[in-house]
Amino acid sequence: MQANKNQDELVKTFKAILKEERFGSQSEIVNALQSEGFNNINQSKVSRMLSKFGAVRTRNAKQEMVYCLPAELGVPTAGSPLKNLVLDVDHNQSMIVVRTSPGAAQLIARLLDSIGKPEGILGTIAGDDTIFICPSNIQEVDKTLETVKSLFNYAD
């Protein structure tokens, strides 16, 4: 039972540290956790936790590259709360733009890239909260738009 309590405290502290948006390296996170009393933490454990909680590196308000958590925690899949991270989907004759919660664009772009050409997506470019999607065929941009919207259960 004590191990579960320690694990819960570690996760809580880990998330709180990442919410500070001031740690740019895994070693800085290790040091912060050790200063909070988690002496058995190491870089490989931090690396696994970053992956598990879907942490991404993004620029903070000071324009420093730091680790942070997406708005919804946990490793996302198309059927998980990932759809909650998509705020807007719009398009013109040649491109689709997806606006996301801060820090979530790269994660969502990776998912879109993985479905790729069969679904009409030639490629993506992601910033912190915006994704540009280049359709495979601009004559079928509306079809690709509907595919993207349905993937995230997005309705206008």
Swiss-Prot record:
Gene3D superfamilies: 3.30.1360.40, Winged helix-like DNA-binding domain superfamily/Winged helix DNA-binding domain. Its main location: cytoplasm. Keywords: Amino-acid biosynthesis, Arginine biosynthesis, Cytoplasm, DNA-binding, Repressor, Transcription, Transcription regulation. The keyword Transcription applies. It comes from the Bacteria. GO terms for cellular component: cytoplasm. Regulates arginine biosynthesis genes. This is Arginine repressor. It comes from Shewanella loihica (strain ATCC BAA-1088 / PV-4). The lineage of its organism: Bacteria, Pseudomonadati, Pseudomonadota, Gammaproteobacteria, Alteromonadales.
